[in-house]
């Protein structure tokens, strides 16, 4: 073993996994944080649509950066949530299994919150697709204006 070996091993040992209770709290806190983040994302996507309609390039660039940073943070929480669920339940955990670990009242609250989160995710996906479709259409129109039609007549 090299001189760095024992030090590295000690550093790994000091980075213990959270307890089961801490893992559950981290998981629940991550869901709550994502609820707020998806509300923010929805607002940003609405702003992005308006900026695209108005052809506001600078605003689109700023919004793209804000969306990207928000999505990165949400992805980090998703990864952490999966790791916490794996710690609590073992490989291939499901949220239904996580719910089952809780007492009835907190379970009902978490299930409701999870359903709301899923709805926010779906709405943000819908808004993201709408924005993407608009931007692609605008790009296509600009290409036609700048470069003309590739083919005026369709073959019979």
Task: Give each language-model segment a name.
Residues 1-13, 95-156:
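Short terminal interaction segments
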Residues 2-97:
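Extended, charge-rich alpha-helical scaffolding segments
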């Amino acid at each position: 073993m090299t001189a760095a070996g024992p030090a590295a091993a000690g550093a790994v040992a000091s980075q213990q996994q959270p307890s089961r209770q801490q893992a559950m709290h981290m998981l629940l806190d991550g869901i709550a944080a994502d609820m707020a983040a998806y509300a923010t994302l929805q607002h940003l996507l609405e702003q992005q649509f308006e900026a695209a309609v108005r052809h506001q390039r600078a605003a689109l660039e700023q919004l793209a950066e804000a969306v990207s940073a928000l999505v990165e943070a949400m992805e980090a929480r998703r990864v952490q949530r999966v790791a916490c669920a794996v710690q609590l339940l073992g490989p291939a955990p499901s949220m239904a299994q996580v719910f089952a670990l809780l007492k009835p009242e907190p379970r009902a609250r978490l299930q409701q919150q999870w359903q709301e989160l899923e709805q926010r995710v779906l709405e943000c996906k819908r808004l993201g697709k709408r924005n993407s479709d608009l931007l692609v259409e605008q790009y296509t129109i600009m290409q036609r204006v700048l470069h003309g039609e590739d083919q005026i007549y369709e073959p019979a």
